[in-house]
């Protein structure tokens, strides 16, 4: 058995004296593990960092075997990602989410979303938007997608600003007003047709994390006996800290 694919490094663990088991999210073969000979050595260490993109050749005698990887770097992001606290936390959090996917099940939309997210970590606010959208996509792939296209109460498709915490359906301003204190807020960047960069406020980011965090916890993590990772909390805190600093630096002098 042999195949060649694109992949993103999710994690690595030592195996024996010199080898390592590498976990990739691949474009065409899903989340897939393989043994890399010499993977525990210093020569391959820079390549096998989470967030790097690689060209992967996988070989095994039988399809169900662990198999061996031969990897070549195609986009070495790790050095840039390790240079900022929000990116370090973000990559760790994204990898932990990707591990919720079943092994060897192709998830091309998740792969492309992860790739776009990793390529845009230099902008703190946009990185936060990407992570929230990644969480939303993960919910859909795991069978718990939110219905944000129309109002769950009336069916209208405009002025959707709330989400029901029970059903996960969008709610319009008019229909939700009597229960506004019990509804979650739907940030503009998650509404249909919103794709502009920097089309968000810091409150929008907080609303987005609260929204996806609630449904991830209730529908995905708690049934597995898990909670939100420390990396997710660290990422959110780093974003808040860096955004506060950015706003202070750009504020006009008093």
UniProtKB/Swiss-Prot annotation:
Biological processes per GO annotation: DNA recombination; double-strand break repair
Keywords, comma-separated and alphabetical: DNA damage, DNA recombination, DNA repair
Record-linked InterPro entries: ARFGAP/RecO, DNA_rep/recomb_RecO_N, NA-bd_OB-fold, RecO, RecO_C
Superkingdom classification of source: Bacteria
Pfam family, one: RecO_N
GO cellular component, one term: bacterial nucleoid
Role this protein plays: Involved in DNA repair and RecF pathway recombination.
Family (UniProt): Belongs to the RecO family.
Protein name in the entry: DNA repair protein RecO
Species of origin: Rhodopseudomonas palustris (strain BisB18)
Upper taxonomic lineage: Bacteria, Pseudomonadati, Pseudomonadota, Alphaproteobacteria, Hyphomicrobiales
């Amino acid at each position: 058995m042999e195949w060649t694919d694109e992949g993103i490094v999710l994690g690595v663990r030592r195996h024996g004296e010199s080898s390592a088991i590498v976990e990739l999210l691949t474009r065409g073969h899903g989340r897939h593990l393989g043994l890399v000979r010499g993977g525990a050595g210093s020569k391959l260490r820079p390549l096998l960092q989470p967030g790097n993109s690689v060209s992967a050749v996988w070989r095994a005698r039988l399809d169900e075997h662990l198999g061996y990887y031969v990897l070549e770097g195609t986009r070495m992001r790790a050095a840039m990602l390790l240079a900022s606290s929000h990116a370090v936390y973000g990559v760790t959090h994204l990898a932990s989410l990707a591990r919720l996917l079943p092994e060897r099940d192709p998830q091309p939309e998740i792969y492309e979303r992860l790739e776009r997210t990793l390529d845009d970590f230099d902008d703190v606010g946009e990185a936060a938007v990407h992570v929230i959208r990644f969480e939303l996509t993960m919910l859909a792939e795991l069978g718990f997608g939110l219905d944000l296209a129309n109002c769950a109460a009336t069916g209208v498709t405009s002025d959707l600003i709330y989400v029901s915490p029970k059903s996960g359906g969008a709610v319009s301003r008019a229909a939700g007003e009597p229960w506004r204190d019990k509804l979650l807020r739907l940030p503009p960047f998650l509404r249909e047709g919103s794709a502009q960069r920097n089309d968000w406020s810091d409150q929008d980011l907080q609303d987005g994390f609260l929204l996806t965090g609630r449904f991830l916890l209730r529908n995905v993590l708690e049934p597995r006996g898990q909670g939100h990772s420390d990396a997710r909390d660290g990422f959110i805190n780093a974003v808040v800290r860096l955004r506060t600093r950015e706003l202070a630096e750009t504020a006009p002098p008093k």
